[in-house]
A protein has these predicted regions:
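Glycine-rich phosphate-binding loops of nucleotide-dependent enzymes
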Residues: 2-201
């Protein structure tokens, strides 16, 4: 039993969330094992996205507890969640379309040189290594506005992976992808599984 408990990276107990009189989540329980892919099934409006956003700190839950590696956690917002090992790719992409791929990858966390100046060379190197590792061919200098929705979504997934998170939450990740891109996404998921990273989709 102890080993089974240690294998659970994320646990939700009694999570509830209401918007006015509309109770969207009603005492939800969920366990996610380390290195697994978990799909959340349900009709539109069933509360899947709401649960994910409560987990990521976008919404604050009304009731319940969340545990990461057995430790109770409560995030004040998405930045707090990212710093503690949980990343999320939203169905509605949150990107700066006038900036290029590299800039979007490092928004809010630009690496700096020893004199405090943004280290663009280091950014490009890390971005290139990430996409090469994921088997993705991307023009790092291309503005996001010139990319298709599916290409932008794959870049956002790559960004979530770049945080070295223990859990990555994907909200309907295949909705804008082509058949070939879905295959690539599943390949990426298998790679993450082998690295012990868990996903909720």
């Amino acid at each position: 039993m102890a080993d089974a408990k240690n294998d659970i990276v994320l646990s939700i107990r009694g999570m509830s969330k209401s918007f006015g009189r509309n109770r969207v989540l009603d005492h939800i329980n969920l366990d996610v094992k380390r290195g697994t892919v978990m799909g959340l099934m349900g009709e539109n409006g069933a509360g899947k996205s709401t649960m994910m956003k409560c987990l990521f700190g976008t919404y604050q839950k009304d009731e319940g507890k969340i545990f990461l590696n057995g430790k109770e956690i409560s995030f004040s917002g998405p930045k707090d969640a990212l710093e503690n090992g949980i990343a999320m790719v939203h169905q509605e992409l949150n990107q700066c379309l006038e900036r290029n791929v590299t800039d979007n990858l490092f928004l809010g966390r630009y690496p700096t040189s020893s004199v405090g100046v943004v280290d663009e060379g280091n950014m490009k190197k890390k971005a290139s290594e990430l996409f090469r590792k994921l088997g993705m061919t991307v023009n790092l200098s291309q503005p996001m506005r010139n990319m298709s929705v599916s290409q932008r979504q794959m870049c956002e997934i790559a960004k979530a992976i770049s945080y070295n998170s223990q859990v990555i939450v994907l909200d309907e990740p295949t909705s804008s992808l082509t058949v070939q891109e879905v295959d690539k996404l599943f390949e990426m998921m298998r790679m993450l599984r082998d690295q012990g990273i868990s996903r909720c989709v």
